[in-house]
Amino acid sequence: MDLDPNLVINHDDTNLSEASFTMEQHTSSYSDIHMGSTPCTGHRKVDMWRNHNFDSGFQTMNHSEAPSIISSLHPSSHLSGMSSMADYEPIPTLSDQQKQKFDGITQNQADGQYNTVRAIPELTMLMKDQDNEVVHKAVILMQNIAKMECDPMRRQNEARIVDPRVIFTLRDLLRDKVEFPNIIRCTLGTFFHICNRQEGIDLVTRAIAEQPDIIPNLIRHIGTYPSSIYKYAILTMHSILSDKQRGGQSVIIARQQDAITHVTPWLEAEKSEKLLPVIVDLIRVLCEKNTEQKIKFVKMGGPQKLLMLLQHRVYENLLWRTTQLLKTFSNFDAPNLVAFGGRQILANLLSHGSPRLVQSTLETLRNISDVPSKIKEDLLLKSLLELVNSRNTTIRLYSAQIMSNLVANNRHNKEFMCGNNGVVILVRALTIATKEMGDLRDKEAQQMEDYIESLICTLRHLCVGHPMSDKVQAFVFRDPALFLHKLLTMRPVLLKHTLSLLLKVVSQHALLAPFRSCRIGDKGFVEQLIHILRVACTQLNVQESIEGVRVKDIIHLCIQILRWITRDQDILNEVVFFLQTPENSRMGDGHTLPIFVLQKANVEENTKSSALALIYNLMHHEQMANVLDRDDVLVKMLQNVQMQSQTHPELASLANNILKMMYEKREKTRNTLPRYNSYLESQFGHMSMTTPRSEALNSSGEVCEGAGEQWSTPLTDDTMMDSYCNSSGRDSSKPYNSPMYHSPPAMYPEYSIGPPETYLDPHATASCYPRPTPPQYNSYDRSPPVYNDLPSNPGPSSHSSDYYPSRNSRF
């Protein structure tokens, strides 16, 4: 295209220059001729339109309130929303002598491309002229070229501004012409239009690599208010720094030059809702993955300024970008965001019609939802209850996660949820999600599992910590099969949280009836709990965690639940039955599951405390008490724990209770026998016999009293003796090698002593340990078939079901 030195194309897209008007005239004439009308017809229509009283924004350049669609597609059109008549660039009037300097830039209709290429070096030289009027005019023409190149309607296939000397000359103008705002403004406008094309970005970044002082000169003018110079400086900086291919080095330079301190004040001072998103995004680029910049932004009150934008602005693009930036600081400065009322301000955005804004808001809220606050969250909780059943999977997931954090350890929020049908909504959502889970695969299934996990967590929090907790527990457990299904799926994350919820529920005695009666197929809660416990025990020495869930936590929760539910006699009978099945009674060296847990040195103290409490409850079952009474390893462990009353009083007290119960059981037998154990008499003779206690077995090599059939003479040499009285045939006089709890070597070593011969006997059913029958069946043959055809001693990990299914195989 030819350039006329007397024509000016302003920086603003909405301003038509004389050149563009001339082009419009030629276009109109061409169309009129081919459409069968005269050229003057088009001119007359334009004149009539100009003389009307209404204003479309074309004459006064006042942009409309609503942003145009093109503003989201073409960056240069952002200028139209930030201009006014006061910002018009005055056309410099040149003298004849000054005009002669532009004679080299000719106007040729036949070869416009040649003259454009030729004009660039000429204009580059004129921008270095000593006459400021000439420089001003040259910069305006260079800006016109840059603007036409970035316009998709008029751009050529190849960029014309490709010489780095143009960039260096523009840099010199920014440095040397500070006192001439018109020149600075056009220079920055030229920079901006060059950067609107990828070839221009590459040119500028290459020039910055050679001479990095381009960035400091741009930053210098971010604070220049006259003639809206700061707008073009900010837009140009944003274009350069946000380039993903070459902007990294420029970002480093901008951080070194403290650009964040120049940009942040405009969050409060700028009024244009079209420029503010650019400012917010520029701050995001500067702060991204850089702690030092984030600290500077926080010290300048940046997060508070962002919250003010959310509170008083309505432009969706601005709100979305602001929440995106706040999301960065929600992990960096969450307590201050909450203290400044961030959760209340963000809650107002959850009713917005933009899905991306709602999702970004929820993500920010999720990051700050775990911060304690005394401010009421009623509006936020109400909005979350509406969104938790959203069709958008991400929105409902974030909503459930936020609710889980808000109700944890917050009595007011729990009461609000219970008083506003929150429990009903959550249970319904959990039921629907469980039904949909089976049809999903891979990523969708993973997201649904996270959603279900959050729902269960929220319900678990609501089951305790407020006056209506009993009613909540009863309502949640109205459909116990919903939670039994979670246990049967054996997904580690869901297992942990479901077990945690069940632990709250079984604390209420009235709910033990549905717990006992609920079944899916032939599986009930007790059977599945013991199965999960066995699987976890087999994995205890193999791996510490499975998919982020600690194996120790699963063991602890199972032991805790078994401890609570064995208060019920019917459930106790069922627990004893499943604990005595071969796969559960032959763990390690041939011990039942609770004893196996006690043997493990890497199990935590609270788990061992629960295991001891479970054993105490099991001692109330006559058949199980006989089994435990014969276990020499258990007796030795209890004796060692009992001696540590100074360091571990709770464990010592539990061990003491079990030993006293054993002793009382032996005393009942002792009254009918001529012999008694002198060791037990000396150990527990001073204790009261009124409280159920337990006792250790004889370790002196004398005749064993209380367990099994009594013999008048020692039968240790009898080859048949072990088949009838297992406890007296075992060598129990070996010294225990660790008197201290949790000190090397471990207090509960995994003994290498072989299992009793009874367990190795292929005809084990004929031994003194008859196979028990659960309370709900009349005979063992009618009990669940899963245990009917098991090998005599398969070992702790020979079953394929002993391992949690991997996520890949599950989904």
UniProtKB/Swiss-Prot annotation:
- Involved in transcriptional activation: annotated span: 1-85, 541-811
Query: What InterPro entries does the annotation carry?
Result: ARM-like (IPR011989), ARM-type_fold (IPR016024), Armadillo (IPR000225), Beta-catenin (IPR013284)
Compositional bias (Polar residues) at which positions? 795-811
| Phenotype upon changing R460W | In ep461; interferes with neuroblast Q migration
Consequence of gene loss (knockout):
Abnormalities in vulval development due to incorrect cell fate specification, resulting in the following phenotypes, multivulva (Muv), protruding vulva (Pvl) and egg laying defective (Egl). Mutants also show defects in Q neuroblast migration, uncoordinated movement (Unc) and reduced superoxidase dismutase levels. Mutants can be rescued by wrm-1 and hmp-2 when expressed from the bar-1 promoter. Double knockout with dpy-22 result in reduced body length, male tail morphology abnormalities (Mab) and dauer induction.
Summary of the tissues where the protein is detected = Expressed in body wall muscle cells, hypodermal seam cells, gonad sheath cells and vulval precursor cells.
According to its UniProt record, where is this protein mainly located?
cytoplasm
Describe where the ARM repeats fall, as residue ranges on this chain.
108-147, 331-369, 370-408
Spell out the molecular function terms from Gene Ontology: alpha-catenin binding; cadherin binding; DNA-binding transcription factor binding; nuclear receptor binding; protein phosphatase binding; RNA polymerase II-specific DNA-binding transcription factor binding; transcription coactivator activity
- GO terms for biological process, alphabetical: canonical Wnt signaling pathway; cell adhesion; cell fate specification; cell-cell adhesion; cellular response to oxidative stress; collagen and cuticulin-based cuticle development; dauer larval development; defense response to Gram-positive bacterium
Statement: the UniProt record of this protein carries the keyword Plastid:
no
Specify the superkingdom: Eukaryota
What GO cellular component entries does it have?
adherens junction; catenin complex; cell junction; cytoplasm; cytosol; membrane; nucleus
> According to the UniProt record, what happens if one changes E449K?
In ep487/ep478; variable interference with neuroblast Q migration
Region (Disordered) residue ranges read 763-811
Query: Does the record's keyword annotation contain Membrane?
Result: yes
Family the UniProt entry places it in: Belongs to the beta-catenin family.
PANTHER family given in the database record: ARMADILLO SEGMENT POLARITY PROTEIN
Q: How does it assemble?
A: Interacts with apr-1. Interacts with axl-1. Interacts with daf-16. Interacts with lin-23. and. Interacts with pop-1 (via acidic region in N-terminus 1-44). Interacts (via ARM repeats) with pry-1.
Function comment: Participates in the Wnt signaling pathway which affects cell fate and may regulate the stem cell divisions of seam cells during larval development. Functions as a transcriptional activator but is dependent on the interaction with pop-1. Involved in maintaining lin-39 Hox expression and regulating glr-1 abundance at the synapses. Required for mab-5 expression during Q neuroblast migration and for oxidative stress-induced daf-16 signaling.
Q: What is the protein's name according to its record?
A: Beta-catenin/armadillo-related protein 1
Q: Which organism is it from?
A: Caenorhabditis elegans
- State the gene name recorded for this protein: bar-1
